[in-house]
Amino acid sequence: MTRNPVVAGMFYPAEYHELLEMIEYCYLNPRGPRELPSKRGKYTKPLGIVSPHAGYIYSGPVAAHGYKKISENISGEITAIILGPNHTGLGSGIATMKGTWKTPFGDMEIDNEFADRLWKECDILDMDENSHLREHSIEVQLPFLKHLEDLNIAKFKFVPISMMMQDYESCIDVGYVIAKVARELNRKIVIIASTDFSHYEPQEQASKKDAVVIKDILELNDEEIFTDVVTHTISMCGYGPVIAMVKAMKDLGARTSYLLYYSTSGDVTKDYSEVVGYASLLIK
């Protein structure tokens, strides 16, 4: 199947040159890394990032921090496993798919072999295109990857995993199988957990709540991520993808983590009465 973008022209520009200008703006912005990716790194081990998925004007500079780090630690052919929450309610509880996704920068091919192995080895994961047709949380990550590809930093395929079902056991199962398949196929991988943090709360309250779960991520404590999201009623839409990513990264040997940047929508709108939190984190 070929999937067409559904939020191009809304969350990010639909036209090539306008999108390139926006991506460069995200990197050079004061809330971004303040420099463009300029050279490929050397891939030595899997990387995991937490990346936001709001409109680029709000969260793009925060996301750019993670992609800058990816650019410094990859080379050659990379499979990007992208986990995102299912906001639409369409399709299966947890699902991948095979085929191609279109972007304004060109097509992104799915690593069909990896997706097929996930489906065969994970009982709770379906092969379901409907889960992905209208969902934006994975789509908004792709232009950043295609931009790195256009800079000749790496060549990407990807695997989309949409998660409507985010109970702890399911997230752990997904993370376990991602790591297992990556080892068995000997893939060079990055794992991207797409999430925003607190939604529509006052700045002070949102930042305090988000600090709790960010601490859990930095400690690679997947169980505490789930517990604190529930206990502190943190309106983080993609905690399941984050838990699955952390589990997979730990199984693949990750031991270190970094908070690259935290910001809120209030830093753009200057309205701090109801903000959305965005964070970029690196695990390796």
UniProtKB/Swiss-Prot annotation:
Native source species? Methanococcus maripaludis (strain DSM 14266 / JCM 13030 / NBRC 101832 / S2 / LL)
Task: Write the protein's name.
Answer: MEMO1 family protein MMP1387
Q: Which InterPro entries match?
A: MEMO1_fam (IPR002737)
Which family, according to the similarity comment? Belongs to the MEMO1 family.
Q: Which Pfam families match?
A: Memo
* CDD domains xrefs: MEMO_like
